[in-house]
Every structure is written in C-alpha cells, then in structure tokens.
C-alpha cells in the first residue's frame, strides 16, 4: 500500500501531515461508521485521554517533518468562470473573516452578505444582482460577534445569526469558565438595508458570572419550500461546548423570528470538548421539498445526520452516514500561511428532485482535496466520495475551505474552495468555483480569482460561503493582504499574522464563454 505520493517531487508540509494523519487513522482504534450502521450497534471510540495523547504526539512529529519539506506541484491554469467578477467589500484598513452571503429567491436581484472582524461585524446589500453594494452596520450601537450565518425567509426577510463571547473558556476546555456568551439573531425586513434595533436571543449565558458552557458555530436556515406544511419556519443549530463534551443544540421559530423555542439536544452521541481533539464541528441544515429537515455535522471521523419530519418538533436519533478524514488540519506550522483550516461538512438539496449533497475536505490522497457525496433516497444511502477538484491526484497541492450550493431553479451544483494547484510551493492561494450540471456526477473547475494571495499565519475564519439562483452564483471569502503590517489575526487566539480582507465573487453561467 502506497501512503505517500511517489516520484521525484518532495513532499509538502500538508502532504506529510495528511499522510501521517492517514497512518494515525488506520492505527488509532477509532469507530467505524459503516460497521455501526450495518450492525445497528453503538459506535466505540478511544478514551479522550488516549485520543489527545495521540494528537499531541502527531503534532510534534508533523512539525519536525514540515520544517524539512518542500512541494513540487504541476502548474495548472483554469478557464475563468463566465461573467466572473471579484469585489473587495471590506473598507480600506479594516479586516474581516467568516463571511456569509444569500440571495432572495423571490427577488433575485436582492443579495445580502455579512462578515466579522476587528470592527465587530458589517453587512452589505445589493439591489442589482451584485453589481453594486452598500455597506451597513446591522448591529447599530449594540455588539455583534462572530460565526455568522444568514438566510432569507419566504417573505423576503433577512435573518442573521451569530455568537457573542465576552470571554473564551480556559485553554484546556472551551466550555470551562467562559463568560457572557450566547447565540443571537438579527432581522432585516428589507433585504439587508435596515436592521432591527435589538437582536433576539436564542440562548444566552449572562455577563458577570462563569457560564457552565459556551455556544459556538450557529447556523440558521429557512423553510421556503412551496409545498411544505412548515413553510416559513426558521431553524437554528449550534455546538454547545461543555467541560467534558460537545453536543448539538437546536431551536426553531414558527413566527418569523419573533420568538424561538427553548433549545434542545439533537445529537445522540456526544463529541470531545475541543475542536482540535475530535469534537463535534460544522453544523448545517437544509429543507426538502416536503418540509423534511436534514442536519449534518462532523463527529471525529464521522459525518453525522439528524432528520426531522415534523418541522423540527422531533428528530430521529442522529446517525453516522459516512466516514471522512480528520476535519481539523491544525495550525500554521502544519498548513503553510494559514492559522488553521477545517474540512467541515456542508449539506444542500436539489429542491426539484430531493437529491441531497454533502461536501467536505480531507487528506485521504496525501494532500487536502474537496469531496462530494450524494443521496437519492432521503439520506439513507450515500454515493462513494467524488473528488471535486480536478488537478492531478497526489500532486501535493491543497484545496480547502469548500462551500456548497445548489441552484433551486435547475439543480446545478456549485462548490467553492481555496486552491493551490498553480503554485509549485503550495503557498499561493486562488479561489476556484466548480460546477456540476449532471447531479453531482462530474464537475468542471473554473478560476474565480486571477491574482493569488499569500498569508503568514492568517486567520481566514472557519468557512467561506456560497449561494446560487437562476445560473447566477455569489461567493464570499477572506483573503490575506500580504503588503500590510502584521496584526493580531485572531483575538481569541492571541496570535499574530497577516490580516485578511473580505471579497465577493460573482459568476453568471447564463453568459456564453
């Protein structure tokens, strides 16, 4: 069995990292999702202390390997996406990260986006399908935190969810001695132009006292399906970090965001308590044509799904649907230029057929690649992983931070990701847009950006974002600005690196090449 790419090329740090992670994967006694499903038995896994010791040992070895490694990547030039435009949305001198974007299906020229950063968060809206943008402050005089997500409902209202943290927990556990944290939702009645004076809390731990846990990575989505009995409902899920575990909490609103139900747990299995030790990560949900909800997340090596058939009142027990590589690629020492990278799962649905799609990134091939799996039977069975990026396999080039969208008007599948295939040193990063017109069976890769960026311990956030309607695609991502002075790139992490700005990409597949 060949573990490392063969030939004259030297291995990059990420390639060695991924190969070593694969060795850990086959030697560490982790649970098998496939076996668990087949046997209908509970999954087994090592103790937290065993898993943590293994990761610490791996980190030491990987750092030593990385310091002596370089990459040799074949130069590849992609065709530019049709009608491609790239706009810098963050104002000069301001940094940003964790950007989100959405289009109003009932008024497709109305597009809204938001992002976090040193200014606490901004939003922007467009009334002409992204040709021009107006920047606004959705928080007014109040605070707004990170880990944003955004959606339109069936009335054209915009809902922006986010977390607000006064103080992180101790280094050992996110949920230990955290203060003043919670999940909030802001509302705009006019497509992002104006925002309500106050945010609505979904779950809040008050200031001035240690909280028993910390809330993180909230994701909001809406039921806009014409034939759904739950049309108009809003749904929100997030990670609840506790001192000994991580779980998924869920809530819903049946009155267009005015109030939210008391959150409850939908993850049957609890993950470890931190993202770099095998915790639950990357929650996202979608709604089928009949109103069925599908929520996915990552739990160690498992992609897990929870399903609700009654508008979020109840959920079936969550279950692993397939296994992936480790979703956490560590810090800048193991992923050149980027402070940390996660291969979190995203889910989307073809509203015409009910076909489900899940994307993620992992390093099963020796470097980080983007993958997609599909289900045509409401999530019961899933196709083998399809590699979305089409550069030569095992070439040492990394593709990462993918996001998924399905055009509800025609079923075309789009995946956006950072791409290093054109740099022999595996440092310069472009943004690529992949498109499938055959229900996710094959993909064509297009260049979205022309000029690459190179970071130095840059914090890009934990995700990018993507949306599509009627052949017009909108993406949002962060890019390092290499010609500026170093700043604190992640306030909660206390590390220094190159700052990032926020970019919006537009592609129009209605235009001929």
Regions found by a protein language model. Name each.
Residues 75-513:
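Extracellular, repeat-based ectodomains that mediate carbohydrate processing or recognition
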Residues 12, 21, 49, 55-58:
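Intrinsically disordered, low-complexity proline-rich regions
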Residues 11, 36, 42, 56:
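Cationic, low-complexity basic patches in intrinsically disordered or flexible, solvent-exposed regions
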Residues 32-34, 74-76:
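Boundary at the C-terminal end of the N-terminal hydrophobic targeting segment
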């Amino acid at each position: 069995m060949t573990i490392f790419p063969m030939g004259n090329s030297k291995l990059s740090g990420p390639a060695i990292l991924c190969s070593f992670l694969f060795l850990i994967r086959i030697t560490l006694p982790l649970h098998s999702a496939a076996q668990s499903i087949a046997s209908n038995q509970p999954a087994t896994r090592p103790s937290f202390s065993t898993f943590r010791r293994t990761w610490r040992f791996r980190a030491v070895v990987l750092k030593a390997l990385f310091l002596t490694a370089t990459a040799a990547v074949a130069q590849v030039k992609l065709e530019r996406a049709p009608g491609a435009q790239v706009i810098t949305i963050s104002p000069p001198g301001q940094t940003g990260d964790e950007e989100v974007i959405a289009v109003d299906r009932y008024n497709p020229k109305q597009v809204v986006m938001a992002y976090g950063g040193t200014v606490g968060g901004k939003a922007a809206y467009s009334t002409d399908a992204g040709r021009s943008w107006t920047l606004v402050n959705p928080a007014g005089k109040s605070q707004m935190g990170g880990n944003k997500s955004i959606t339109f409902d069936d009335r054209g209202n915009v809902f922006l969810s986010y977390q607000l943290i006064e103080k992180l927990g101790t280094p050992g556990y996110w949920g230990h001695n955290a203060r003043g944290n919670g999940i909030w939702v802001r509302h705009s009645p006019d497509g992002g132009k104006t925002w309500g004076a106050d945010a609505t809390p979904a779950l809040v731990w008050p200031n001035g006292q240690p909280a028993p846990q910390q809330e993180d990575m909230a994701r909001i989505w809406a039921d806009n399906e014409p034939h759904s009995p739950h049309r108009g409902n809003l749904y929100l899920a997030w990670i609840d970090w506790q001192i000994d575990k991580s779980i998924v909490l869920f809530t819903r609103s049946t009155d267009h965001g005015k109030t939210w139900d008391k959150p409850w747990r939908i993850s049957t299995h609890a993950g470890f308590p931190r993202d770099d030790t095998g915790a639950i990560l990357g929650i996202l949900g979608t709604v089928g044509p009949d109103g069925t909800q599908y929520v996915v997340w990552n739990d160690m090596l498992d992609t897990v799904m929870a399903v609700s058939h009654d508008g979020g009142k109840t959920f079936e027990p969550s279950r692993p649907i397939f296994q992936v590589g480790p979703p956490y690629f560590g810090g800048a020492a193991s992923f050149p230029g980027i402070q940390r990278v996660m291969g979190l799962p995203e889910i989307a649905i073809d509203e015409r057929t009910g076909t489900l799609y899940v994307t993620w990134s992992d390093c099963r091939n020796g470097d980080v690649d983007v993958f997609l799996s599909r289900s045509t039977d409401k999530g019961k069975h899933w196709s083998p992983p399809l590699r979305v990026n089409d550069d030569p396999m095992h070439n040492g080039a990394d593709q990462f931070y993918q996001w998924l969208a399905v055009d509800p008007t025609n079923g075309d599948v789009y995946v956006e990701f950072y791409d290093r295939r054109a740099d022999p040193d595996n440092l310069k990063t472009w943004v690529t847009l992949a498109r499938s017109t055959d229900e996710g069976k094959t993909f064509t890769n297009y260049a979205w950006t022309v000029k690459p960026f190179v970071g130095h311990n840059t914090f890009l956030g934990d995700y990018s974002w993507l949306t599509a309607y009627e052949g017009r695609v909108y993406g949002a991502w962060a890019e390092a600005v290499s010609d500026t002075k170093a700043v604190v790139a992640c306030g909660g992490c206390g590390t220094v690196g190159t700052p990032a700005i926020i970019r919006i990409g537009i592609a129009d597949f209605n235009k001929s090449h």
